Amino acid sequence: MFASLRRFQATPAYGALLSSLKVDLKKAMIAKNNMEKTTIRSILSTIKNNEIDGGAQTEFELSKVLGKMVKQRVDSAREFQQQKRDDLAEIESKESEIIKKYVESLPVASDEEIKEKLTHFLNEIKANDANTHVGAIFKQINDDLASSWGAAPSVIKSMVPSLYKDIFKK
């Protein structure tokens, strides 16, 4: 019962990606594409484990989880290449490419885009009041602003201190 309730709270992009993954899994099974099949199953398993752990069901959380999976695959491929295991490195590289395809399909802004928007936002605040305290800026960053930027509030808030120093301490 609770799983269905949690799925109800998921964002549309979250549900769309899950549907896409399930359709792609079925296609990979029909085509007998084992690489894609096992990678998609791994993605679905990781997402399910994240849901069980109580993770938010948003595109931002999915981006974080899938980004972590890509990083793990890239690191593993590098390790395998150092150990002269090119066969295993190739498998990890292919898996990371498959996962990247799904990360790119999410409507999430890149760090550069967020930084650019945040810089513009902070410059507007400075133009209105050059003595604005960083705490007041944190209060202005809410879920609505974050979703309109295509970013998680936590990602935006993690960038505020360094940009605040650059802009307000000039």
UniProtKB/Swiss-Prot annotation:
GO CC field: mitochondrion
UniProtKB keywords: Mitochondrion, Transit peptide
Presence of the UniProt keyword DNA-binding in the record: no
Organism domain of life: Eukaryota
Record protein name field: Altered inheritance of mitochondria protein 41, mitochondrial
Family stated for the protein in its record: Belongs to the AIM41 family.
InterPro entries from the UniProt entry: Asn/Gln_tRNA_amidoTrase-B-like, YqeY/Aim41, YqeY/Aim41_N
Gene Ontology molecular function terms on file: carbon-nitrogen ligase activity, with glutamine as amido-N-donor
Localisation: Mitochondrion
Location, primary (coarse class): mitochondrion
